[in-house]
Design a protein with these regions (language model features):
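Thiamine diphosphate
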Residues: 2-149
C-alpha cells in the first residue's frame, strides 16, 4: 500500500487504455520493507513506516479507486480472500483488490542487508536473499561464480 503511492500515475494509464489488468494491493499499513529493516536492526521506535510509527498516513484505497474509476474489492481476513480473488478475476476490465495483512507479517525471501561480525552492514548481491543460505549451499546452487566481498 505504501509503494503503490510511488506509481499512482499508472492507474490512469490503465484506465485510459481500458486494460484488463487486475491490481492486488497487499495493505500492510505502510512501508513494510522499511518497517522490517528497522525492527530487525534497530528495534523501536519506528520512524517513517506508516500508522504504527505515527508520522505517516495513507489514503483510503476504496476512495482512491473510485477517483480513478476502478471497481474495488477488499479482503480483510483470510476467510474473505478466496471470494475476493475470484470476484476480482471474474470482473471485466481493470479492478483494484485490496488485501489487508498484519503489520507483523514477514516477507521472505527478500533482499536484505547482512550484519558482519564487526557490526557493519553490507548489501549482498540480489541472488543472496534472506533468509540467507549457508555459503556452501549457495555455491552449489549458483551456475556462475559468486561475488564475495
Amino acid at each position: 500500500d505504501g509503494s503503490i503511492q510511488m506509481n499512482l500515475q499508472e492507474l490512469q494509464t490503465i484506465i485510459h487504455h481500458k486494460m484488463g489488468i487486475k491490481i492486488f494491493i497487499i495493505n500492510n499499513g505502510g512501508y513494510h520493507s522499511i518497517r522490517q529493516t528497522q525492527k530487525n536492526f534497530f528495534g523501536e521506535p519506528l520512524v517513517g513506516v506508516g500508522y504504527d510509527s505515527g508520522d505517516l498516513s495513507f489514503p483510503d484505497m476504496e476512495k482512491l479507486s473510485a477517483a480513478y474509476g476502478y471497481p474495488y474489492v477488499r479482503a480483510e481476513h483470510n476467510g474473505q480472500l478466496a471470494e475476493a480473488v475470484e470476484k476480482t478475476l471474474a470482473m471485466e476490465g481493470p479492478v483494484i483488490c485490496e488485501i489487508i495483512v498484519s503489520t507483523d507479517q514477514n516477507f521472505e525471501p527478500k533482499s536484505s542487508a547482512k550484519r558482519l561480525p564487526d557490526g557493519t552492514l553490507v548489501s549482498p548481491p540480489l541472488e543472496d536473499m534472506a533468509p540467507f543460505l549457508p555459503d556452501e549451499e549457495m555455491d552449489e546452487n549458483m551456475i556462475i561464480p559468486r561475488i564475495k566481498g
